[in-house]
Amino acid sequence: MAKASVVVPEQVGAAAAAQVGCPCPGTTLFPYPPPRAGIAVRRKCLQAAQQLELGAGLRGGWVESMRASSPTHAKAAAALAAGVDEEHAAWMARHPSALGEFEKVVAASKGKQIVMFLDYDGTLSPIVDDPDAAFMSETMRMAVRSVAKHFPTAIVSGRCRDKVFEFVKLAELYYAGSHGMDIKGPASRHAAAKSPPHNKGVLFQPASEFLPMIEQVHQRLEQATSSIPGAKVENNKFCVSVHFRCVDEKSWGALAETVRRVVREFPRLRLSQGRMVFEVRPTIKWDKGKALEFLLDSLGFADCSDVLPVYIGDDRTDEDAFKVLRRRGQGVGILVSKHPKETSASFSLQEPAEVMEFLLRLVEWNRLSRTRLRL
């Protein structure tokens, strides 16, 4: 059966909009036009980052990629003064606000089960200098709890699953930590009662064999970066993060070279970069997109046309999930960002406060819809 639960912003144009009614299976109906030239600098940095993930590139390439991951960098301010307002308007036309297009988003869910996927840092909580202090507000927790009462809800984070649970403190959710390499289902009886029998307490760890190696690289990175002020190494169980948000920019090159040197000692691990952070992960083909598909399958929605996955995230690692939605030709990808950047998401929200507003509106819309059905 065709998957037609797709939302296309009107601004994308008639060519994309004309595809909405196409019943052909496998057709991509999302608005994914080619990126405009206005994002050329950021695209160049992202391409450099992709090469660096493969071990290529010089120290300078790493530093440029690190700057690209810092939207508040002085270069961003200079670019804004140079006329980024026009670029931002063009980007918003391609990735309009999920709040402004809310009715279009929920219209796509008619006759379908919404399943929510939420990143944590930068999505449910603000980005802070100390990753151990990235607490979500109580109002955000209430919003997520309300969403979970109406829709199956998962937190998909690069953090250690246990750490994310400490922050969120909601037992009725699914948690996918370490970029989806550590997945566990709801613990509460109420949540389990609403889940398929084969899904209760699901636990999936595709990278278990890497645990000793991750511990080794964590120790090596802590030792190697101890002389660089501000560098923080975090063990996320199945991956290791090296945060450089508090590192002086003059030391970025030295930090990048240090991290690369350590990771080269572990050929079965790969190095990538996120938002002001280096990520060291196993080389297995598993990411947030794979986690999204695994969770949909666990919920009984594999290859179903009566489901609408909604994924909200702010980081490069969330792009894997956005690309899965694009490939499936169904669902809603929402990027959280105040700055234009290349993305496979359909819509955007600027900050966690807007994410909370979107979640609360979704809950209220669902309540009103149920009330109308009873009348």
From Swiss-Prot:
Homology family: Belongs to the trehalose phosphatase family.
Query: Gene behind this chain?
Result: TPP7
Q: Which reaction does it catalyse?
A: alpha,alpha-trehalose 6-phosphate + H2O = alpha,alpha-trehalose + phosphate
Q: What are the alphabetically sorted keywords of the record?
A: Hydrolase, Stress response
For this chain, the annotated S-S bridges are none
Q: What is its EC number?
A: 3.1.3.12
Query: By what name is this protein known?
Result: Probable trehalose-phosphate phosphatase 7
Pathway per its UniProt entry is: Glycan biosynthesis; trehalose biosynthesis
* Keyword Hydrolase in annotation: yes
Look up the record and name the cofactor or cofactors this protein needs: a divalent metal cation
* InterPro entries per UniProt: HAD-like_sf (IPR036412), HAD-SF_hydro_IIB (IPR006379), HAD_sf (IPR023214), OTSB-like (IPR044651), Trehalose_PPase (IPR003337)
Ranges in coiled-coil conformation: none
* Enzyme class of the recorded protein, top EC level: hydrolase
Where is the organism placed in the taxonomic lineage, from the top?
A: Eukaryota, Viridiplantae, Streptophyta, Embryophyta, Tracheophyta
Q: Function, please?
A: Removes the phosphate from trehalose 6-phosphate to produce free trehalose. Trehalose accumulation in plant may improve abiotic stress tolerance.
Q: Which GO terms describe its molecular function?
A: trehalose-phosphatase activity
Supply one GO BP term.
trehalose biosynthetic process
Q: Does the keyword Ligase apply?
A: no
- The signal peptide, as residue positions, is none
